[in-house]
Design a protein with these regions (language model features):
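Catalytic cores of nucleotide-sugar-dependent glycosyltransferases that transfer UDP/GDP/TDP-activated
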Residues: 1-312
C-alpha cells in the first residue's frame, strides 16, 4: 500500500554460505536496465522499497533487532517505523541504524511530491524532521529518526559536522553528535586471503610474501601495459571517483609523482571530471598510470595483491 496506490511485492530468497538473503521483487520499479534512472521515479521506487521491506518482515517471519539502512534510498525506513508501522506489535522495539556513505546525495524533492509519494502527513515536514528549506529530504528523515547514525570513518564523521562537508545537514549532525559514529570499511579476510585467492596470479602468505607478492605486481604491470619493474612503487586505487574521496588533493601532484619511480592503477567509476583526469594521466604517462574506468571484482583482487600502497 503506497499512499493512494497498491503495488505488488514479491519476495525472493537465496541462501549463501548459510546466510539467508531476501530480495524485494517488483517489475515496475526494478525491471529496468540500470538501478537508477529519473530522479523523481527513483524517489517513488525507494519509498516503495522502504515500505516493502517493513511489510515483508512478518511474512518471512523474521523480526530483526536492528535494521541497518544505507544512504537516502532507505532513509524512509526509520520514518515509517515511527509512523504507519508504529502501532503494529510485531515492530515494537526494532532499532534502526542509518549509515551515510556519501552525504552529497540526499533524495531531495518538493514537499508536495514527497507527501504524495511517501504517504506522510504534514507533521513530518517541519524543519526538525524531513523539511529541507522548501523541499522534503529522505536522508534527513533517516538521520532524524534512526537510533544511531554511522559513517565510513571517524574522520568523515567529524568532517560532516562542519559547513564545508556537511552538505546543508551539518547542524542536524552536530545535534546528533552523541549518536554519530565512524566505522571504517572492512574486508572479508576469507575472500581476500592472498594465500587462497583464486583471482590473483601468485598466492602468498605472511611467511613468503617478501618473495612471492612482487610476482603479482609484475604480472599486473604486464597485463595493464605498465613498465615491468618490480622496484617501481605501485599505488592502487579501487574506489568511487568522487569529491568526497579527496582526488582533488592528488590532481596537482600527479605530474610530479609520475616523474618518480611511482605507478598508479585506478579501478572505478564516478564523477566525469575525475574519470577524465585519470584518463588524461593514463594517456600522458602510459607506462606509469593505468586508468580502468569500470569495476571488475577479479581485477580488484589483483590490484589489492599487487600494489605496495593503497589510496582511499
Amino acid at each position: 500500500d503506497l499512499c493512494w496506490r497498491k503495488q505488488y511485492v514479491g519476495i525472493m530468497e537465496l541462501e549463501y554460505e548459510g546466510v539467508k538473503i531476501y530480495f524485494i521483487d517488483n517489475e515496475y520499479y526494478f525491471g529496468g536496465e540500470k538501478p537508477y534512472s529519473d530522479a523523481r521515479y527513483d524517489l517513488e521506487k525507494f519509498a516503495f522499497f522502504s515500505r516493502a521491506v517493513l511489510s515483508a518482515l512478518p511474512v518471512i517471519d523474521f523480526r530483526p533487532d536492528v535494521i541497518h539502512c544505507h544512504d537516502w534510498h532507505t532513509g524512509l525506513i526509520p520514518v515509517y517505523l515511527k509512523d504507519s508501522f508504529a502501532s503494529g506489535e510485531f515492530y515494537q522495539g526494532i532499532k534502526t541504524i542509518m549509515t551515510i556513505h556519501n552525504l552529497k546525495f540526499q533524495g531531495v524533492w518538493d514537499i508536495d511530491t514527497i507527501k504524495d509519494i511517501a504517504g506522510l502527513s504534514d507533521y513530518y515536514f517541519t524543519s526538525d524532521k524531513l523539511k529541507d528549506y522548501d523541499n522534503g529530504n529522505y536522508l534527513k528523515g533517516g538521520i532524524v529518526y534512526a537510533d544511531m547514525v554511522t559513517t565510513v570513518s571517524d574522520t568523515y564523521a567529524e568532517e560532516i559536522k562542519t559547513p564545508f562537508f556537511g552538505e546543508g545537514l551539518d547542524g542536524l549532525l552536530r545535534a546528533r553528535s552523541n549518536c554519530l559514529r565512524g566505522i571504517v570499511n572492512g574486508i572479508d579476510y576469507d575472500e581476500y586471503n592472498p594465500a587462497t585467492d583464486k583471482y590473483i596470479d601468485k598466492n602468498f602468505s605472511k611467511t613468503n610474501f617478501r618473495k612471492e607478492k612482487v610476482k603479482n605486481k609484475t604480472a599486473l604491470q604486464k597485463e595493464l601495459g605498465l613498465e615491468v619493474n618490480p622496484k617501481k612503487m605501485m599505488i592502487g586505487i579501487v574506489s568511487r571517483l568522487t569529491d568526497q574521496k579527496g582526488f582533488d588533493l592528488i590532481s596537482c601532484v600527479m605530474d610530479e609523482m609520475c616523474q618518480d619511480a611511482v605507478q598508479f592503477v585506478i579501478l572505478g567509476t564516478g564523477e566525469e571530471r575525475y574519470e577524465n583526469m585519470f584518463r588524461h594521466f593514463d594517456w600522458k604517462y602510459g607506462k606509469s598510470v593505468s586508468a580502468n574506468i569500470y569495476y571488475s571484482e577479479e581485477r580488484s583482487h589483483k590490484v589489492y595483491a599487487a600494489c605496495d600502497a593503497f589510496l582511499m
